[in-house]
Amino acid sequence: MSQPAIRKNHMDVLWHEYTDNNGENIPVTQASLTEKASIIGRVGIMLLSCGTGAWRVRSSMNTLAEAMDVTCTADIGLMSIEYTCFDGEDGFTQSLCLTNTGVNTSKLNRLEHFIRNFETEGKTMSGNQLHDLLDSIEEIHGLYSPIALGIAAAIACGGFTFLLGGGPIEMFCAFVGAGLGNFLRCKLTKHHYTLFLGIVLSVSFACLSYAGLLKLGEVFLHLSVQHEAGYICAMLFIIPGFPFITSGIDLAKLDMRSGIERLGYAMIIILVATMSAWIMALILHLQPVDFLKISLPLSDWILLRLLASFCGVFGFSIMFNRPVPLAVTAALIGAIANTLRLELVDLINFPPAAAAFIGALTAGLLASLIKNKAGYPRISVTVPSIVIMVPGLYLYRGFYNLGIMSLATSATWFASAILIILALPLGLIFARILTDKTFRYCT
């Protein structure tokens, strides 16, 4: 017996119904205010679905509004836009919502091209033709299969493990655990399962896979139980670095609603993920002990950190649906910036938060240098290049110690994590202030 279809909680917007009757051959600049506003609002909500911040969404909506000779004001959050368009005589107000949020740089890049070329190409098209073009852009889903995204998470978390102090055994176990965990997460997302279920199951599966591999190693290879330290690294693919960082950028531009909503979304993911990992640790008798010490010459440390940082950023970039050339660009920037951050801490005893600020500032400046040559939005390069600096290990250890009522230790880990999380968007913000005059002023 077939299951009844699940009724959608958010109804689909039939965009072509907003076009004027008999307006197929009329340029959109001569269309009604309703038709113009439908183009502006649809582009805005599509940009928002790609994960970009409120300032960028509003800027793009303004570009289209100016080209069509209307005025647009917009209030933008994480999942919705309320906007009004004026043409000097009438006003049109609409509220648009997303069903889910995520990151899709491939779609974002196509939308950026659409906006850049609108003045020369889009103004001559009819509203119906523009909606047809937006239909084709909206169909751009993930570039990669769940298997490929699982491998990307495995590469990222394997590199992450080394940067946190893990050795080959921890890296291999985290590689397998993260790969399986993110594969499951992608399959659940593809079938539209709710956010909480996806987080709990994927994190639990990653931790279980790590623990299972380690137990096999203990039985057959007589591995030390201290290698359990890396189980945290198997779940770091879930850390929401993108909304964490974009929330800081939005708050810097006083887009309070978007910034607070993005921060709240990131905190929800952190809370559910760390609680799931903590419960799995209790069930599997795992503890976040220190990694076994690795002794290497300074030159080897630097080279291996460059390589591990490259792998980590490359993997996260693929998870954010970036094309391979763009992922490589972000990985090169991230390798330089993150290695600089780590060496500042190790060689001259820089406070970790200050080093994180300099690392993020470096990433932002490097991204600005290649922005025009790369032809991609700046955020597509800057955010992935510093996501690897988000202190997921600190956040988990803070929650783990909170769970066992070691409150002083928990506060120490949380304080360290908060300082670094604050420093990362500040570094990108100051890089943007230094290199982008449109961002420098309050407009």
Residue ranges and their predicted role:
Residues 1-132, 136-138, 142:
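Soluble N-terminal domains of membrane-associated systems
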Residues 128-141, 155-166, 185-193, 284-297, ...:
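Short juxtamembrane and helix-loop transition motifs at transmembrane-helix boundaries
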Residues 143-246, 319-320, 324, 329:
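Core alpha-helical transmembrane segments of integral membrane proteins
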Residues 147-151, 171-176, 197-201, 263, ...:
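Hydrophobic alpha-helical transmembrane segments
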Residues 159-164, 180-188, 205, 209-217, ...:
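Alpha-helical membrane-inserting segments
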Residues 161-177, 226-240, 292-308, 348-362, ...:
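Structural signature of hydrophobic alpha-helical transmembrane segments
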Residues 217-226, 284-299, 401-412:
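Membrane-interface helix termini and inter-helical loops of multi-pass transporters
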Residues 230-235, 246-250, 254-270, 332-443:
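C-terminal transmembrane helix-loop-helix hairpin of multi-pass membrane proteins
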